[in-house]
Amino acid sequence: MSQNSEKRHVSFAAIDQYVETNIVLPTEKVTNRDFVEWGKGNNYPGYLLDLYNNVTTLRSIINGNIDFITGDDVTILPLGERFADGIMNTRGDLITDIVRDLAKDYNLYGGFALQIIRDHNGDVAEIYYIDMRFIRSNKENDVFYYNEHWDKGGRKDVIIYPKFLRNLDWTSLSDEERDRHASSILFVKNVHTQVYPAPMYAASVLSCEIEKAISQYHWNSLNNNFCPDIIINFNNGDPGDEIKEEIVSDLEEKFSGYQNGKRFMVSFNKDRMSAVTIDAIKTDDFSERYKALEESSRRQIFAAFRAQPLLFGLNMDVSTGFSTDEFEQTFKLYNRTQIRPVQRLIADAFDRIYGSKGVLTIKPFSLESNTEQEVN
């Protein structure tokens, strides 16, 4: 057989681009333990907190909502004569700070929790904010389990609390029952058909992951000096499937995917004359495609909150701009549909604890011509 007619065998392996997602679904798993697990690994709240810490758009919206919900001032009726106005417990927590924490948890997780401490007469003596990340519940939401290390199994140091019941007949309770109800949990959630709440942006979690991945890609592209997509040729013959897989796996682990901002292709050739040739491997409009994807993801996140970007200092339509009147009208609608309902939930929670109406007052977030009424 002549050299021209010799059949050449080229072994080729392409490393597919790999965009790792660690999406944790909000599953509710009933196990042999007393509480219902919240997400894979019982760590759905931890996953949402990670998104908040790493997705700029999500963090901006939630932080803005916290400011809007807390308003310009928060006041509450004093808890007896023990504390000065606005102080809610022996730790010295102010009602304004507690409302901010509740607003954050509601926007981040879809619910919030408060710990209520009673005195020896059964009266409410102290109120504490409880981080929703650390709360798990039984199916009926009448027993709660507190642990700061659910992500590590949460089998140790679990504190059990009953549901807060305002109208307990304290005098008729046994000593054991009084001890059990001396500290209880008020658990507020935005859905009543499942054990745990659901964040408003649940449908846009994938968009959050995309924005997070794009930021990671650009960061690593910068660290890698914007190295272009390339093909790697091994021109010393076919080493066999096992060794090829080992080489490809090693390269893939080190260099492929959004976390390294580049993509490799590998070719195993008999010699240099057999090397694979590829033209125009790099996409000319790559950066534009990323930009379009990033903008689409950002819009999806805003849509999940029913929010307008201009309320949070971002004008995505730079060709038009916006006026003060447009901002005020947009804010009034957003305040009525998205902010005041959360303020009402928080105010109602304190009404339930105190056993009377109008104990908490939130002064609305002020605009120059704001005429909103107080929430109490």
Language-model features: locations:
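Structured, contiguous alpha/beta core segments that scaffold functional sites
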Residues: M1-I66, T70-N269
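A contiguous, surface-oriented mixed alpha/beta subdomain in the mid-to-C-terminal portion of proteins
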Residues: N190-A349, V359-P364
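Extended, compositionally biased alpha-helical segments that mediate assembly or anchoring
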Residues: Q373-N376
